[in-house]
């Protein structure tokens, strides 16, 4: 709008300038006729040219303003009115997640039962027969051990009961020494000592009721001596004059 009004004003000024210039030229050409027409004619012609120029300027129509773009109002979303006669559907309950199926345990195989051995039928023997059987077993054991003692040169009788007792004691101590084991911990700590073990001997030479009668001061050494006596085997029947209660010293010494 502003550019168009400026162009119209510029055009009017240019037209006025050219009209003035044309009238000036016309005035020079008609200078000689001024005397005849007089000064009033010049004024009239100039006045006419100015009116013509103004008329041309007024005849130009003013440019119409451009119409503003129509404002489009955004359509508001229509609110849906709930029908009171229609009942709303109840909301669906969310489905519960299915629990994962547990893997089925394989049935455990039952251990096969071992076939039971048939028990030997024990006949009820009278007391007299039982005593006979026990006496016979004792006699058999005595004979076998007796054979062992006769083969042992240390237990052969020399006609003196004292010598037989001493020989039996020496053989008994050697049997205990065979089963003696020095405890590793006691050896590392360089523990030493002598343990006296007292035990009972029956007529067949079987050891029982072993106990510590004198300690070495070390529990490990005492237990090792007691185990050695309990592991000793019978060396034969007791000789005449040999007591049933016997005490044997068991020595633990470290030799470099």
From Swiss-Prot:
<dbReference type="GO" id="GO:0015031">
    <property type="term" value="P:protein transport"/>
</dbReference>
<comment type="similarity">
    <text>Belongs to the TonB family.</text>
</comment>
<dbReference type="InterPro" id="IPR003538">
    <property type="entry name" value="TonB"/>
</dbReference>
<feature type="transmembrane region" description="Helical; Signal-anchor">
    <location>
        <begin position="9"/>
        <end position="29"/>
    </location>
</feature>
<dbReference type="Pfam" id="PF03544">
    <property type="entry name" value="TonB_C"/>
</dbReference>
<feature type="compositionally biased region" description="Basic and acidic residues">
    <location>
        <begin position="121"/>
        <end position="132"/>
    </location>
</feature>
<keyword id="KW-0812">Transmembrane</keyword>
<keyword id="KW-0813">Transport</keyword>
<dbReference type="GO" id="GO:0015891">
    <property type="term" value="P:siderophore transport"/>
</dbReference>
<feature type="topological domain" description="Periplasmic">
    <location>
        <begin position="30"/>
        <end position="256"/>
    </location>
</feature>
<dbReference type="InterPro" id="IPR006260">
    <property type="entry name" value="TonB/TolA_C"/>
</dbReference>
<dbReference type="GO" id="GO:0031992">
    <property type="term" value="F:energy transducer activity"/>
</dbReference>
<comment type="function">
    <text>Interacts with outer membrane receptor proteins that carry out high-affinity binding and energy dependent uptake into the periplasmic space of specific substrates. It could act to transduce energy from the cytoplasmic membrane to specific energy-requiring processes in the outer membrane, resulting in the release into the periplasm of ligands bound by these outer membrane proteins.</text>
</comment>
<keyword id="KW-1003">Cell membrane</keyword>
<dbReference type="InterPro" id="IPR037682">
    <property type="entry name" value="TonB_C"/>
</dbReference>
<keyword id="KW-0997">Cell inner membrane</keyword>
<dbReference type="GO" id="GO:0030288">
    <property type="term" value="C:outer membrane-bounded periplasmic space"/>
</dbReference>
<feature type="compositionally biased region" description="Low complexity">
    <location>
        <begin position="138"/>
        <end position="154"/>
    </location>
</feature>
<feature type="region of interest" description="Disordered">
    <location>
        <begin position="59"/>
        <end position="162"/>
    </location>
</feature>
<dbReference type="GO" id="GO:0055085">
    <property type="term" value="P:transmembrane transport"/>
</dbReference>
<protein>
    <recommendedName>
        <fullName>Protein TonB</fullName>
    </recommendedName>
</protein>
<keyword id="KW-0735">Signal-anchor</keyword>
<feature type="domain" description="TonB C-terminal">
    <location>
        <begin position="167"/>
        <end position="256"/>
    </location>
</feature>
<dbReference type="InterPro" id="IPR051045">
    <property type="entry name" value="TonB-dependent_transducer"/>
</dbReference>
<keyword id="KW-0472">Membrane</keyword>
<keyword id="KW-1133">Transmembrane helix</keyword>
<feature type="topological domain" description="Cytoplasmic">
    <location>
        <begin position="1"/>
        <end position="8"/>
    </location>
</feature>
<feature type="compositionally biased region" description="Basic and acidic residues">
    <location>
        <begin position="89"/>
        <end position="112"/>
    </location>
</feature>
<keyword id="KW-0653">Protein transport</keyword>
<dbReference type="GO" id="GO:0098797">
    <property type="term" value="C:plasma membrane protein complex"/>
</dbReference>
